[in-house]
From Swiss-Prot:
PANTHER family xref list: ZINC FINGER SWIM DOMAIN CONTAINING PROTEIN 4, 5, 6 (PTHR22619), ZINC FINGER SWIM DOMAIN-CONTAINING PROTEIN 6 (PTHR22619:SF3)
MF terms in GO: zinc ion binding
Keywords: Metal-binding, Neurogenesis, Zinc, Zinc-finger
Function: involved in nervous system development, important for striatal morphology and motor regulation.
Record's keyword annotation contains Zinc-finger: yes
Lineage: Eukaryota, Metazoa, Chordata, Craniata, Vertebrata
Name of the gene encoding the protein in the UniProt record: Zswim6
Pfam annotation, one family: ZSWIM4-8_C
Protein's organism: Mus musculus
Descriptive protein name: Zinc finger SWIM domain-containing protein 6
Amino acid sequence: MAERGQQPPPAKRLCCRPGGGGGGGGGGGGSSGGGAGGGYSSACRPGPRAGGAAAAAACGGGAALGLLPPGKTQSPESLLDIAARRVAEKWPFQRVEERFERIPEPVQRRIVYWSFPRSEREICMYSSFNTGGGSAGGPGDDSGGGGGRQHGRGAAAGGSSSSPAATSAAAAAVAAGTGTPSVGAASAADGGDETRLPFRRGIALLESGCVDNVLQVGFHLSGTVTEPAIQPEPETVCNVAISFDRCKITSVTCSCGNKDIFYCAHVVALSLYRIRKPEQVKLHLPISETLFQMNRDQLQKFVQYLITVHHTEVLPTAQKLADEILSQNSEINQVHGAPDPTAGASIDDENCWHLDEEQVQEQVKVFLSQGGYHGSGKQLNMLFAKVREMLKMRDSNGARMLTLITEQFMADPRLSLWRQQGTAMTDKYRQLWDELGALWMCIVLNPHCKLEQKASWLKQLKKWNSVDVCPWEDGNHGSELPNLTNALPQGANANQDSSNRPHRTVFTRAIEACDLHWQDSHLQHIISSDLYTNYCYHDDTENSLFDSRGWPLWHEHVPTACARVDALRSHGYPREALRLAIAIVNTLRRQQQKQLEMFRTQKKELPHKSITSITNLEGWVGHPLDPVGTLFSSLMEACHTDGDAFSGFSDCTDNMGQCKSLEYHHLPAHKFLEEGESYVTLAVEVALIGLGQQRIMPDGLYTQEKVCRNEEQLISKLQEIELDDTLVKIFRKQAVFLLEAGPYSGLGEIIHRESVPMHTFAKYLFTSLLPHDAELAYKIALRAMRLLVLESTAPTGDLSRPHHIASVVPNRYPRWFTLSHIESQQCELASTMLTAAKGDVRRLETVLESIQKNIHSSSHIFKLAQDAFKIATLMDSLPDITLLKVSLELGLQVMRMTLSTLNWRRREMVRWLVTCATEVGVYALDSIMQSWFTLFTPTEATSIVATTVMSNSTIVRLHLDCHQQEKLASSARTLALQCAMKDPQNCALSALTLCEKDHIAFETAYQIVLDAATTGMSYTQLFTIARYMEHRGYPMRAYKLATLAMTHLNLSYNQDTHPAINDVLWACALSHSLGKNELAAIIPLVVKSVKCATVLSDILRRCTLTTPGMVGLHGRRNSGKLMSLDKAPLRQLLDATIGAYINTTHSRLTHISPRHYSEFIEFLSKARETFLMAHDGHIQFTQFIDNLKQIYKGKKKLMMLVRERFG
């Protein structure tokens, strides 16, 4: 808490004493009887608070007995202590003074004594975050008499009754046991070390003897707390002052200067000192009482001494006050009496615990500014948990703190920025807003809220609701759902124009809840008694108040009814919440049975029509009020709570991780449960009812994600419960209902196209039921495999559904933002069934048929095929041939689905399919090759499928004999030729390779290449095939293909690095090696296709180095002469080369820069070498140079370089 160095402000109340003052001087220390010190036993806590002196005495005696060591007797508590304690809890001291003219001093002392808080739980609550659930003790009285350790005058009378070891153990119990909330998270300033929490540090300071000079003057406690020296910090002494009233701390100050939301460790230490060691605290009456007993001389001496001791601080103020008092017309003389900071609260003062509003606002502002980083979301969730803890303690600061938090949320500048940019807020931030709205629902539904307080909240909520940036309930769009307090519109009412409805914000439901009340007599009877029945009531109508067994029912909009349960839990009424929850669940079960009977009747009357209207446009799972989660948590909490001392629960909803260590017990049945039923069975059944409800997929990304997230959270909670025979019966019962209940069930025969899919829920049901009822498990899972939103047409029976649904639920696809997640869940369900069906041919066939019918994603089917393959080929068992065939069948479907579409995993899929077919057997390989055109592209069929099938590894893997090898080879050759005919450009080479061993097939493939060479094949493909032919020992065929490739080629003058140059050189070398005729035939093609001078000169030189045909590829030698450059065909090549140099030179000179001059001179040098190969080359080159000098004489520097080199 933001403690400040100055003293607390003086009390507002003005104190004066008329002439017959109270109390004799020096009066004693209270009654001699000295009753128990903070007597408040946990047994007094349940239900309505104990009233009257007798109840207080009984509680006090029980507590005192618990505090005394064995063997000591306990005297009865005095009437003075009983009365004083009750007065101290309920009345402000001013009312006591006004009520009684004279109050004896012993009575004043006992009232002052009992006015300090007696529960350490509240001190802990205001000095640390709460990360666990509430304690088993439940909320304490408004007076603060909670479930912590209480010490009072009884302990004081006999001295300290605890040893140091016992004190230490008690401190640990207070910090970690059921007496206080568990604290496991750090505050914003303390990081993650639990020992640094203010409450823990306060206990450590107290037990280390660091608290000193403790003084209680009236309703004011002061003392010093010494902070031990910790290097490099020196020892510090903090002055602490605490004001209190009616067992609540109303203000705190500490000189440590620490600023935080919660009390600092020094305040904690002083408070716990007063609670644990009240006998060691000097107690004085309010200072005004002491002053009243002084005469004039004593008063003057008192004032002068006070000024002398503190003259530097007090003197200016003292002189100012003296001047005002001496002035007759001063304001101070217009008021009777004077303020007394130790005299307690006035009648008008609000009685609540001290909460530093400024620091709450500042901390929330800091957390929000961090934008979700540094654990700010966690810190804000802890603040929300603190609000819930305060509500459970029935502390008015809960609503006050939530108001401060909400104001900072509404002032977050990011809200307007997101609204302007049209972007959605982050998911974590959105969840914080949801929790904010849920907390306001709890607050306005407080069953004991005063009307004026509710009116104040309503006004504030409407103010926030009207702000433009106030977030919408559905995250992105205005919700079209009906009001909170009304049932869902059906029939003609459903046609109302939803576009005219205002947007619903996160506060809308809380605003609507302000209209709800708790005065209904039936509701009051339900929550107040376990014996509320009417066995004579036989009304069996839809809205009857009792069922046929006489048990009470509660008919209300289900989320609203569950919001009441949550409000009762949150405000510390767990028994009442449980009673209402049971009534709601019994109502749901009765409605479920009536829905089943109604559907069966309609089905008989209309046997050829299917009813598919959705009765729940507003689903319970993912609902902003989380009705199913509320009922489930309320019932599950009762499973591990003693029914006889039922006063509160640990919060299993807020911290489900802790509940894993709890064992859920089937406690004795409640009055309104069937024989053999328990809270566990009821919780599980209501969860199954909610999860199986048919409901429309909501609009907007956030709400759709919330539906998925809440469903998974609820299922994860169910999975923590171990199934026994009783729960299995519940599962069977609900599974049968889901299958037979028609439009009321998400697993009915025919559902609406936009219904939320049941894949995740069905997977849980399947795995749960499989060991107990496999047939039912498979029925559920197979029915849930549907994903109608992806179907091109609705089911036939859907055509006869009531048409009013269409206006309420428009066709929104593809606005299913979570579709990819839904499809993955569908895939998980199918994979689970495949795994379970291993070895069962009939089940596998059924599952396969369902997959092929309902899954529309090729990637998910491929994943299923892979999963099935892995399961079928586990290392520790023989391959399951049936499951392998299923895997292959799924793979074939993937091939067909992706054949005409682009898929980056296609090559992986093809390779995997061949692997799978190999495992199935040779007939599978033969089958996919024979029907390749429905599965693969020609390229895939030749380069991957046929090549892999013909590989040695496949032959070895399958242990094929010669006959089988030949059969596969024949199929592969047929495939290759078909592919080459269809796509010669990409398949010709593969076809030739595959047909090598069969002469006829090879010739056929070669002819296909020749036929395609003149039309569609590129020079690159032809050169590749030509090189292959040369490699296989067919030089003439290679030459033929090379000449065909040359006709498609075109190299310009500047493409001296073209990738085809090597192919051209290879083709010329091949022709040269074959003989003069072949060379003579290819040179005209080269001259026509190649314009690059350097390439032509390279070819020319290679042709002049050896005799044509001198070393043929076939090994023969030719002793002919070198070819002459003056005769064909080399003369034509030489002229073309010279011409290319001339043209290239002019082209380069057109756009030459000085930095390229030296490179150009080198180019001319190479050109001269080529010129000189002709018999008149010298003359030609000289003329060429002269011509350049004349044409480009403007390039003086360049021409000068030309002259220097070439003359």
